[in-house]
């Protein structure tokens, strides 16, 4: 059972949650910063804005609160305040209906470096409700009932079909940061220290660059749409986009293929099962050409045929990139672990390797194409 908190329920629900002391949160990784656009904002310049909600643009990769702020001189300024991606807000129970047009609100955040009509929304207080952080949860969700979920398909393969997502990273009050949802109580009680929690895996993996790889990584402009594909509504890589920022992805097992629908940018990837070899003439693409086979209960996926791109900013790759992924289901915990290894002789001399784990998703997969509204990332819209 799941109870969403919307509209009139907002104030009542918020009053049941402890107040949040103002604090500057430590960002999890460079990759997280890149997505949330903190390069545009100055954390040394906190802002507190009082005014009226005009609406919300509930989109990926950044949602925006439209807000009429009233200054000390009584004049009104139309503000745009950046929030999290719609996909991530939805997982936390946020809905557009919470932001009632005309409602009084206070926004706490950080000033834009160049645009006085823009801000980064860190906390918000709507009406009489307590102040809430951008990463807070607005839904109460009981554990997903998996008792009737078959561990295998009729054909015998492990049942990896369905909707999957990395565990949410949420606020641990008093800890000054985000932690995996299942550790919140332990962190708040002092049983577990934030510094002892493994990273989210959203950032680049350690790798030894070639001379070219190092030069291009050093020159990479994190906040430039020309360099960073996420800032121009393009996926980054099949490695990063599987977990970065906690999207809900869908796997569909078919007779001769496995289809993965990635949640944050709504693109489809096809894995051709039991194809002996890649075709000779592959048209290079973002996702490459993937073939897979089962080694016991492990799905092994081999992918080549990439167009040059970015593995995880600032690590770039060439059309010689070769990725091998191994997906293994734990039918007792209902987790899906992926180990991956990437090789590219043009950009690095060793292997770019890592592992991640996703859970049965807490909300259904929902196609939600990218709609970048940040003016700085839309150069064609500028006069």
Language-model features, listed with the residues they occupy:
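PEST-like low-complexity, intrinsically disordered acidic/proline/serine-rich tracts
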Residues: 36-383
């Amino acid at each position: 059972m799941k109870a969403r908190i919307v509209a009139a329920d907002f104030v009542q629900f918020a009053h049941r949650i402890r107040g949040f002391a103002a604090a500057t949160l430590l960002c999890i990784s460079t990759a997280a910063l890149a997505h949330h656009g903190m390069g545009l904002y100055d954390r040394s310049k906190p802002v507190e804005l009082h005014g009226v909600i005009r609406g919300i643009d509930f989109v990926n990769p950044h949602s925006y609160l439209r807000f009429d702020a009233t200054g000390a001189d009584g004049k009104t300024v139309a503000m745009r305040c950046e929030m999290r991606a719609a996909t991530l807000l939805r997982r936390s129970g946020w809905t557009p209906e919470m932001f009632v047009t005309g409602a009084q609100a206070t926004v706490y955040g950080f000033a834009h470096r160049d645009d006085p009509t823009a801000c980064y929304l860190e906390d918000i207080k709507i009406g009489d409700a307590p102040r809430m952080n951008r990463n807070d949860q607005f839904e109460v969700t009981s554990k997903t009932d998996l008792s009737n979920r078959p561990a295998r398909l009729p054909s015998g393969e492990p049942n990896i079909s369905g909707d999957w997502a990395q565990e949410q990273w949420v606020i641990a009050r008093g800890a000054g940061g985000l932690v995996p949802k299942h550790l919140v109580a332990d962190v708040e009680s002092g049983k577990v220290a934030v510094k002892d929690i493994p990273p989210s895996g959203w950032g680049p993996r350690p790798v030894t660059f070639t001379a070219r790889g190092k030069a291009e990584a050093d020159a990479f402009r994190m906040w430039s749409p020309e360099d960073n594909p996420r800032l121009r509504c393009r996926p980054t890589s099949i490695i990063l986009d599987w977990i970065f920022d906690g999207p809900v992805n869908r796997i569909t097992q078919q007779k001769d293929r496995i289809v993965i629908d990635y949640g944050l940018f709504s693109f489809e990837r096809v894995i051709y099962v039991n194809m002996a070899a890649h075709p000779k003439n592959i048209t290079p693409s973002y996702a490459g050409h993937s073939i897979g086979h089962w080694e016991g209960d492990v799905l092994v996926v081999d992918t080549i045929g990439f167009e040059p791109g970015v593995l995880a900013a600032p690590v770039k790759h060439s059309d010689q990139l070769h990725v091998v992924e191994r997906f293994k289901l734990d039918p007792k915990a209902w987790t899906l672990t992926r180990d991956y290894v990437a090789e590219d002789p043009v950009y690095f001399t060793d292997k770019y390797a890592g592992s991640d784990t996703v859970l049965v998703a807490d909300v259904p997969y929902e196609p939600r194409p990218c709609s970048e509204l940040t003016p700085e990332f839309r150069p064609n819209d500028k006069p």
